[in-house]
């Protein structure tokens, strides 16, 4: 029961503390180790383990805890193995190589076959030992842990900051647990070059290497490309790991400022591209920035008149108007009204001088203008003598036109009634003794001169009226 509880306790704890690369000689906090026998550990002097399944040069895995073997190995169909870097202490390495044990080939594999699955982590312990008796003897150099089991036991004075280590050559109780291997496997003594981290390959990223300038391509004939330039050695691949990386030599300013073409045309037989190849380049650094030339123009544009200066007049400059103060008028209202009055007065004077005065005329038609007929107003004629309206017969429309109508009785006197003339139809015996037609009768109303009203219409007796003496 105690073994099961200790196993569960060891599995629940995680190996979070890893040795630091800056302080390799100082021990770190103790972490429980997965082993079934008491053992002592020593400070680790080598960096932490890294997995073969990941990149050797990855820095993110340095100091990461190692998960259980069944969590990783069963997913890929094989059991992964871990390697560590070669110890830096030659004495400890020689001591460990003298006690090599070829039986263990994996870091998480041990000669002891436990019933439970143990954790492959660092050999750091902080729990009291469940075995019998403390361990003694000199502590060897830190090596990767090569044991795993369900039981976790360690001495009360054991603490280490490197990978889990087996106990050194000291007296231990052989009856409390199996013996563990305390040496590096034969296959891990000489790590291949491809598995060891290549720090020389990272040197090319430490120093910035300026990009080499490209020379303008000059094409002599249409359709012919320039000469082939082989790539420089070492430009495509990293430098060899055996030789240390030296910082590249800084190129001179003339090399950086040398012209580089913007691009190349699709057809190499274009005359314009060949003519402007020298102009299509990056401006030198001493003349200003590249954006300055794009804002203010290019220095070497093609023109038919090389000596002609550039025009200073632009659309934006010509259409620019100075801002005006809207709140404050430029001149007063009295000045504006006086100017308007003077303008109208001067315009009238100039118009009067240029255009002559027109004469007033009456409206007349073409016929009136051609015949020059004078129109007379119609008015009653003036009376020659006074009239008595009581005794005289009034002038009417029929009296004025009585002489023009046929069969009308002749008017002999002014008091002659207006009636039909029946003298022509009267029988002869009845007409005897009667005056003849159109003869004036003698009477009190006989007038020697007929009124002008009777003669106005141009009657028959108007001009030949006979007067008889009284």
Swiss-Prot record:
Expressed in testis (at protein level). Not detected in brain, heart, kidney, spleen, liver, lung, thymus and colon (at protein level). GO terms for molecular function: microtubule binding. It comes from the Eukaryota. It is found in: Cytoplasm; Nucleus; Cytoplasmic vesicle, Secretory vesicle, Acrosome; Cytoplasm, Cytoskeleton, Microtubule organizing center. GO terms for cellular component: acrosomal vesicle; axonemal A tubule inner sheath; axonemal microtubule; cytoplasm; cytosol; male germ cell nucleus; microtubule organizing center; nucleoplasm. Residues 1-21, 51-60 have a biased composition (Polar residues). Pfam families: CFAP143. Keywords: Cell cycle, Cell projection, Cilium, Cytoplasm, Cytoplasmic vesicle, Cytoskeleton, Differentiation, Fertilization, Flagellum, Nucleus, Spermatogenesis. This is Sperm-associated antigen 8. Microtubule inner protein component of sperm flagellar doublet microtubules. Interacts with FHL5 (via second LIM domain). Interacts with RANBP9. Its main location: cytoplasm.
């Amino acid at each position: 029961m105690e073994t099961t509880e200790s196993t569960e306790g060891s599995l629940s704890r995680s190996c979070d503390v890893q040795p630091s690369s800056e302080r390799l000689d100082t021990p770190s906090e103790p972490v429980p180790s997965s082993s079934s026998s008491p053992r002592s550990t020593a400070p680790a002097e080598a960096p932490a383990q890294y997995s073969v399944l990941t990149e050797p040069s990855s820095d993110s895995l340095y100091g990461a805890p190692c998960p259980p073997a069944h969590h990783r190995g069963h997913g890929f169909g094989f059991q992964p193995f871990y390697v560590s870097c070669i110890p830096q202490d030659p004495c400890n390495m020689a001591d460990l190589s003298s006690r090599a044990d070829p039986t263990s080939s994996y870091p998480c594999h041990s000669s002891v076959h436990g019933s439970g699955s143990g954790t492959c982590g660092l050999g750091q312990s902080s729990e009291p030992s469940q075995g019998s008796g403390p361990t003694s003897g000199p502590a060897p150099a830190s090596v990767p842990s090569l044991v795993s089991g369900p039981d976790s036991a360690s001495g009360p004075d054991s603490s280490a900051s490197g990978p889990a280590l087996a106990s050194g050559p000291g007296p231990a109780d052989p009856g409390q647990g199996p013996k563990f291997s305390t040496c590096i496997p034969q296959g891990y003594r000489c790590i291949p070059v491809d598995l060891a981290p290549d720090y020389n390959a990272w040197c090319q990223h430490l120093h910035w290497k300026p990009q080499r300038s490209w020379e303008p391509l000059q094409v002599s004939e249409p359709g012919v490309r320039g000469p082939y330039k082989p790539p420089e050695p070492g430009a495509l691949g990293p430098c060899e790991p055996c030789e240390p990386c030296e910082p590249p030599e800084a190129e001179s300013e003339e090399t950086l400022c040398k012209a580089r073409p913007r691009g190349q045309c699709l057809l190499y037989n274009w005359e314009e591209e060949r003519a402007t190849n020298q102009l299509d380049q990056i401006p030198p650094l001493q003349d200003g920035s590249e954006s300055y030339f794009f804002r203010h123009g290019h220095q070497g544009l093609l023109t038919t008149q090389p000596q002609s200066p550039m025009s200073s007049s632009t659309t934006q400059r010509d259409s620019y108007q100075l801002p005006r103060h809207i709140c404050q008028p430029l001149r007063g209202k009295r000045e504006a009204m006086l100017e308007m009055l003077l303008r109208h007065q001067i315009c009238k004077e100039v118009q009067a001088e240029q255009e002559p005065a027109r004469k007033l005329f009456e409206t007349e038609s073409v016929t009136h203008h051609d015949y020059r007929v004078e129109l007379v107003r119609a008015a009653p004629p003036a009376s020659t003598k006074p009239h008595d309206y009581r005794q005289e017969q009034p002038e009417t429309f029929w009296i004025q036109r009585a002489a023009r109508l046929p069969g009308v009785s002749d008017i002999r006197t002014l008091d002659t009634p207006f009636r039909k003339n029946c003298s022509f139809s009267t029988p002869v015996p009845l007409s005897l003794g009667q005056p003849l037609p159109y003869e004036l009768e003698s009477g009190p109303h006989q007038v020697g001169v007929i009124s002008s009203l009777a003669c106005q219409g141009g009657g028959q007796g108007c001009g030949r009226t006979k007067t008889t003496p009284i």
